[in-house]
Every structure is written in structure tokens, then in C-alpha cells.
């Protein structure tokens, strides 16, 4: 693999790191101020809402909207006004001085006068034996991605907040039963969400218990529970477990550059979005330890863009000096949205579509290694990884074939290879599965994972 850094000479006015409501709103407002923001969405673009089933409390959507749909709309709106979006992950930053720089996982360096941090949060796991070992084999943090694999089965949800209730309610569409395990007697969830869960006959409750281990060898067979009052341990027999115990701020990228609190949240000055580093602003759940709502994240993204615009006008002599008025509609040369990502990849003709019927000929009998992407049209993270796989398929076509299998229309092979989480990518060599990768990853990370099996990837 070629990891030599490459610098781009253009100095941008604003770079936004992260997406979700905060990142996309910051991009929208910066674009309307004619700052032409460069946005690094990352491979988890769309943020936590990409795994949310239903958003009922975002103003303007009286009938609700799914998380991926809301993010799709926000992303397209930012594009429409001229934001430049890239799905690369940022690996390191240099934020001191008048010109800031970011380095992507692919070794590319980009520069800007101001930076907006909107990396959001990541899923908090239990950190117990068996959890990471069985991730993607019955352990999940995304009900919308993986719930359909547990039709007619007994599963568990761990947590006590709104997210746990939402996951449990969604999973009742597929599971025979859902047991909600919480370490306390009282729940943090809102009354309306808790009431819905209690009124669902498929949902059972176990309170005052912690999960001490996930049982299973190749797949989940149960949970080891400990009573927080008596200390007694029991086994709950389930085939799947969904973790919904909250999130942690993704601040490790800047933890040695800007001030953060003991829990990792980026600190801002007063009622602004300014961080301890001049010209660096922060927004969304990366900052907010109290409200953590889509609407508050969007609001702080707006504030960050306005703060950055004013700072540039005062300090950098940028385009922000030329206009602070809202602009009218503009044409964007890039209007791609997530709903077309899978179609675009397919039409490019580099990846191949395989089915249960063609699996033997296309995959198991291939002379070349074949990376099979198990995906579905409704899977948000699958849309994230689709263009990355298309790019790898094009660049590595001499060493590797990339194939896609829709688990909805071709469930047999998914069952055969115990795929219970998507996206799951399995590398086949000589007709045998030799590598399994669960979850959306960036190009550089995927190539690193594959290079120990397939040589000469670059």
C-alpha cells in the first residue's frame, strides 16, 4: 500500500470534520456564506442518526422521518449550496497557527483557515468477555441494520434510555421476544417511550441486573447476568444482543490540541462554539453532554458556521469579508445522495452482482480472491461503504474481485455463512472464507484489513 502523504495546494476557507446534523448544518450555512466548505464526512457519515429507526421530534416532520432520510435531505441541501463532501476519514490534524491542516487515512493533506469539529459520538460498548469476539455474530448496536436476521428468535436489548426502548420496539417486528436488561430499577427513558415498551406484549423486562459476559463460540447463545442486589448470576438464553447504553464523544483526534473535559467532550467558550484553539470551532454531540438531540446538534452546527464566518472576517481577510448576506439558490455539480449510491456502484460495472444461484460459479470457483459484500437496500452503513468498494474494485481488479449480494433477495448464502449483521464483507480464497470484516470502513482501513491475505494491494 502507498501511504506517502500528498499535499493539496488549495487553502480552503473552512474545513468541517464530521457529518450528522451538526456537520451538515455547518456545511450548509458555510456554503450559503460562500465559504465553499470542504467536509470530511468519514466512513460513518450521517452520524448516529444513520442507525435510527424513526425521528418523531424533529420540527417540520409531523409524521416523523427515519434517521437516514433526514440525513440524506441535510446532505443534499449542503451539496446544493456548494459544499464539497468527501467520505474520507481524517487521521490527524495540525490546528495551531493561521493555516490548519488535516491528513486523511489515505495520506492526503488539506489546508484551511478555520476548522469546525463535528465528529459526534461513537457507540459505547459493555467491554465484557465475548462482546467484541461476537460482534457481527449476534452482538450488534444497530437494530435497523441487523434486526431482520433474528426473525422468530429470542433476543435482548441492553440499556435503559430512549435508544434502548426504540431498539426494543423496532426489534419486535422480527423477534419472537425481546428482553430489555437494565442495571437499575428506574429507567432514564421518557415516559412516552417507556410506556410504549411496557405496552408491547413481546417485550420483557429484567431490572437490577448487569451483563457480565456474552456466551457463545461462533454465534451468541446467551448472556451471563448478575443481580446487582444479591450478586447471584444466571444465564439468559438468547441468540442476539443489541447494545444501547449510550455513546462516547469522538474527541481522540483533537484531545491533545483543544481543551476537553474528563469525559472527552470538547470544551467551548461561553455561549459560543469557539474552542481553546484560535480558529477552531466545535458543534453537536462532540460538545453537548446534556441535550444530545438532532435539533440541538443542528443548531450548534449553524452557530459554528456563523462563528467561523465572523472569525474569518476579523482575522483572515477571507471571502467572509465580501458578503455576510444569505445567498439565493445555486447550482451544484455534485447532487449525489445516498439513495443512489448503490445504483451508481452497480452501473459502474466494476463490482459484480451475485445471487444464491450464481454464488458457486462467481465466488467459490473463482481463481482470484473474491470480496463479497453482504448488503441490503435499506441499510444505512451499507450505503456508506458502497462507493468505497466500487473504488477498490476498480483499482485492485488485477488482484481482487468485489461482489455484492443482497441479503433480502438472496438469504440462503447469508445463512450459510452466518451473516447476522450488515454490512459484512467476507473474503473468499480458493473457495474458502478466509477473512470477515463487519461494519462500514474507509478505503485505507479496508485495504489494511485485506492486505494480510491478498498481497500487492495499493
UniProtKB/Swiss-Prot annotation:
| Keywords associated with the record | Cytoplasm, Disulfide bond, Electron transport, FAD, Flavoprotein, NADP, Oxidoreductase, Redox-active center, Transport
Instruction: Relay the cofactor remark from the entry.
Output: Binds 1 FAD per subunit.
- Linker as annotated region, ranges: 322-347
Q: Which cofactor does it need?
A: FAD
The entry marks the following residues as binding FAD, namely 19-22, 41-48, 57, 90, 285, 292-295
List of residues binding NADP(+) = 163, 182, 188, 245, 265, 292
Q: Catalytic activity annotated for this protein? A: [thioredoxin]-dithiol + NADP(+) = [thioredoxin]-disulfide + NADPH + H(+)
Region Thioredoxin reductase: start and end of each range?
Answer: 1-321
Q: Which InterPro entries match?
A: FAD/NAD-bd_sf (IPR036188), FAD/NAD-binding_dom (IPR023753), Ferredoxin-NADP_redctase_2 (IPR050097), Pyr_nucl-diS_OxRdtase_2_AS (IPR008255), Thioredox_Rdtase (IPR005982), Thioredoxin (IPR005746), Thioredoxin-like_sf (IPR036249), Thioredoxin_CS (IPR017937)
Provide the Gene Ontology terms for cellular component: cytoplasm
Report the EC number(s), separated by commas if there are several: 1.8.1.9
List the cysteine pairs that form cystine: 142-145, 379-382
Molecular function in Gene Ontology: thioredoxin-disulfide reductase (NADPH) activity
Q: Which PROSITE patterns match?
A: PYRIDINE_REDOX_2, THIOREDOXIN_1, THIOREDOXIN_2
Highest rank taxon of the organism: Bacteria
Q: Which intervals hold domain Thioredoxin?
A: 341-455
Cross-referenced NCBIfam families: thioredoxin (TIGR01068), TRX_reduct (TIGR01292)
How is this protein organized at the quaternary level? Homodimer.
The record makes one more remark, namely:
In the pathogen M.leprae, thioredoxin reductase (TR) and thioredoxin (Trx) are encoded by a single gene. N-terminal part of the protein corresponds to TR and the C-terminal part to Trx. The active site is a redox-active disulfide bond.
> Which family does the record claim for this protein?
In the N-terminal section; belongs to the class-II pyridine nucleotide-disulfide oxidoreductase family.
What this protein is called in its record is Bifunctional thioredoxin reductase/thioredoxin
Amino acid at each position: 500500500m502507498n501511504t506517502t502523504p500528498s499535499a493539496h495546494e488549495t487553502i480552503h476557507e473552512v474545513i468541517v470534520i464530521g457529518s450528522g446534523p451538526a456537520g451538515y448544518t455547518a456545511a450548509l450555512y458555510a456554503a450559503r456564506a460562500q465559504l465553499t466548505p470542504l467536509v470530511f464526512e468519514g466512513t460513518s457519515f450521517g452520524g448516529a442518526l444513520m442507525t435510527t429507526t424513526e425521528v418523531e421530534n424533529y420540527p417540520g416532520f409531523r409524521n416523523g422521518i427515519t434517521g437516514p432520510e433526514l440525513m440524506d435531505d441535510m446532505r443534499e441541501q449542503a451539496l446544493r449550496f456548494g459544499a464539497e463532501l468527501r467520505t474520507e476519514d481524517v487521521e490527524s490534524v495540525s490546528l495551531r497557527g493561521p493555516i490548519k491542516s488535516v491528513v486523511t487515512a489515505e495520506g492526503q493533506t488539506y489546508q484551511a483557515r478555520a476548522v469546525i469539529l463535528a465528529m459526534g459520538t461513537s457507540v459505547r460498548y459493555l467491554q465484557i468477555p465475548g462482546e467484541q469476539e461476537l460482534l457481527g455474530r449476534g452482538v450488534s448496536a444497530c437494530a435497523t441494520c441487523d434486526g431482520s436476521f433474528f426473525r422468530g428468535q429470542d433476543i435482548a436489548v441492553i440499556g435503559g434510555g430512549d435508544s434502548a426502548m426504540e431498539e426494543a420496539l423496532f426489534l419486535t417486528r422480527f423477534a419472537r421476544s425481546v428482553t430489555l436488561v437494565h442495571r437499575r430499577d428506574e429507567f432514564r427513558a421518557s415516559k412516552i417511550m417507556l410506556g410504549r415498551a411496557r405496552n408491547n406484549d413481546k417485550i420483557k423486562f429484567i431490572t437490577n441486573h448487569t451483563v457480565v459476559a456474552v456466551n457463545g463460540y461462533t454465534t451468541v447463545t446467551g448472556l451471563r447476568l448478575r443481580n446487582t442486589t444479591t450478586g447471584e448470576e444466571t444465564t439468559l438464553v438468547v441468540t442476539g444482543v443489541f447494545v444501547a447504553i449510550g455513546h462516547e464523544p469522538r474527541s481522540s483526534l483533537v484531545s491533545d490540541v483543544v481543551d476537553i473535559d474528563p469525559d472527552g467532550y470538547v470544551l467551548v467558550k461561553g455561549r459560543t462554539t469557539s474552542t481553546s484553539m484560535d480558529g477552531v470551532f466545535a458543534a453537536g454531540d462532540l460538545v453537548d453532554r446534556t441535550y444530545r438531540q438532532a435539533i440541538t446538534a443542528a443548531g450548534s452546527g449553524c452557530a459554528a458556521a456563523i462563528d467561523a464566518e465572523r472569525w474569518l472576517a476579523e482575522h483572515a481577510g477571507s471571502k467572509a469579508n465580501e458578503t455576510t448576506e444569505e445567498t439565493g439558490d445555486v447550482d451544484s455539480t455534485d447532487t449525489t445522495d445516498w439513495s443512489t449510491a448503490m445504483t451508481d456502484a452497480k452501473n459502474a460495472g466494476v463490482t459484480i452482482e451475485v445471487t444464491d444461484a450464481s454464488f458457486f460459479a462467481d465466488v467459490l470457483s473463482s481463481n482470484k480472491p473474491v470480496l463479497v459484500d453482504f448488503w441490503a437496500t435499506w441499510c444505512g452503513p451499507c450505503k456508506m461503504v458502497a462507493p468505497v468498494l466500487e473504488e477498490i474494485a476498480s483499482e485492485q481488479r488485477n488482484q481482487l474481485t468485489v461482489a455484492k449480494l443482497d441479503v433480502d433477495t438472496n438469504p440462503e448464502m447469508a445463512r450459510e455463512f452466518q451473516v447476522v449483521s450488515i454490512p459484512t464483507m467476507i473474503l473468499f480464497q480458493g473457495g474458502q472464507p478466509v477473512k470477515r470484516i463487519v461494519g462500514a470502513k474507509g478505503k485505507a482501513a479496508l485495504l489494511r484489513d485485506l492486505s494480510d491475505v491478498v498481497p500487492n494491494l495499493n
